């Protein structure tokens, strides 16, 4: 087992780290406060190839591996959880789905624009009555001649208000349950498609989280991904990969808060000495550090298994479950270390704590991850 990154992976990490520190960190507090989507940085990331790291050069990608992509999400999330999830949702949930399940025509038409960052992508599965119960889809798709007509709505869609390419799941045969769900590529300009309510959120406030509305939305027949009835399987396999991205986001948030806490402990003085000299806080730091390292190994292992085309579903669930819990614990402890200052916006740890919470919820709640893990263990 090799715990060293390759030269290429190190280069990706260093490049993204420098970008995160120089371009993302300076505006992180401002975009959180104003809920402003950081389009200028998304465009810069596109030019640097950061929106297509794991995709083949044939389709405009960087030709990197899964771990390189995960390292990028981690580094971005150290300074801004919002920026991390923008990249993760675009890459893991939309572009990767088309790469894995799309046909050559669909890849040629859509994947290149996504991999180069010319267009942003989003993933539309969650509905008002179908969150964890993804099988309870109410959006329907009816085939009429050379097109499908979609009716329904999706909620809590990351990148919803800024994406141009969407993956939408809809029922093509309600009588078949999960086997009646199909997946479609929908463009924002398709007739009958619109963006609904924009959510106001506790954390990741600068990400565009919206409702998607389809009223007699016309989708060309050729935009069906795979075959009718295969959508549920496509969604579940895609979410397996997406969970590694969110685990990387959680890992990055935890690392960012940890670094802030360590720096503060070295400079903050109480009773005539730095608070880093107090054993109680030293033990807290030791626990935070150890849990971050444990989370890192789970996340990197899941990424490596995915890259090797080995079974990774349970490993992705473990990584997301643990990294999310660690992110919540570490950010909360970081706020505690800062004391009253940690509760103010003068320091970034309160934002990091707010950003961390969502990692326990989206792309499968922690409870769902436990079901996946337990199901495997008890099989």
Language-model features: locations:
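Flexible, glycine-rich active-site loops centered on histidine and acidic residues
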Residues: 95-101, 123, 135
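A short, Trp-centered hydrophobic/proline-enriched beta-strand micro-motif
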Residues: 117-125
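Short Gly/Pro-enriched turn/cap motifs at secondary-structure boundaries
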Residues: 87, 114, 129-132, 156-159, ...
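Short glycine/proline-enriched turns and hinge-like loops at secondary-structure junctions
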Residues: 64-65, 133-135, 159-164, 177-180, ...
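Alpha-helical interface subdomain recognition
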Residues: 1-89, 101-106, 113-118, 131-134, ...
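A short core secondary-structure module
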Residues: 146-147, 151-195
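Flexible, small-/acidic-enriched active-site or ligand-binding loops
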Residues: 136, 189-220
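Short Ser/Thr-interspersed hydrophobic loop/turn segments at strand-loop and sheet-helix junctions
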Residues: 49, 73-77, 170, 186-191, ...
């Amino acid at each position: 087992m090799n715990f060293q990154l390759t030269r290429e992976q190190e280069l990706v990490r260093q490049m993204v780290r420098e970008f995160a520190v120089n371009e993302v960190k300076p505006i992180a507090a401002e975009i959180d406060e104003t809920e402003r989507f950081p389009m200028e940085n998304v465009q810069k990331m596109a030019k640097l190839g950061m929106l297509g790291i794991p995709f083949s050069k044939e389709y405009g990608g960087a030709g990197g591996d899964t771990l390189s992509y995960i390292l990028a999400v981690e580094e971005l999330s150290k300074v801004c959880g919002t920026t991390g999830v923008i990249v993760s949702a675009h890459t893991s949930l939309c572009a990767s789905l088309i790469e894995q399940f799309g046909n050559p025509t669909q890849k040629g038409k859509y994947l290149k624009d996504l991999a180069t960052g010319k267009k942003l992508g989003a993933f539309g599965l969650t509905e008002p009555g179908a969150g964890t119960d993804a099988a309870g889809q109410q959006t329907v798709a009816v085939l009429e001649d050379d097109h499908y007509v979609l009716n329904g709505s999706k909620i809590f869609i990351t990148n919803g208000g800024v994406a141009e390419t969407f993956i939408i799941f809809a029922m093509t045969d309600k009588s078949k349950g999960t086997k009646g769900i199909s997946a479609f590529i929908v463009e924002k300009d398709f007739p009958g498609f619109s963006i609904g309510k924009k959510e106001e959120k506790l954390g990741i406030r600068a990400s565009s989280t919206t409702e998607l509305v389809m009223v007699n939305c016309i989708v060309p027949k050729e935009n069906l991904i795979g075959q009718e009835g295969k959508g549920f399987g496509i969604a579940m396999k895609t979410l397996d990969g997406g969970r590694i991205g969110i685990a990387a986001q959680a890992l990055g948030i935890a690392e960012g808060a940890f670094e802030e806490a360590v720096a503060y402990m070295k400079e903050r003085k109480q009773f005539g000495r730095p608070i880093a000299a107090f054993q109680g806080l030293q033990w807290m730091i030791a626990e935070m550090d150890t849990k971050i390292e444990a989370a890192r190994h789970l996340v990197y292992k899941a990424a490596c298994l995915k890259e090797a085309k080995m079974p990774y579903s349970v490993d992705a669930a473990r990584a997301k479950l643990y990294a999310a819990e660690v992110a919540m614990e570490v950010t909360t402890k970081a706020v505690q270390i800062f004391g009253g200052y940690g509760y103010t916006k003068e320091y970034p740890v309160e934002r990091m704590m707010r950003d961390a919470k969502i990692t326990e919820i989206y792309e499968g709640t922690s409870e769902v991850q436990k079901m996946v893990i337990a199901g495997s263990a008890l099989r």
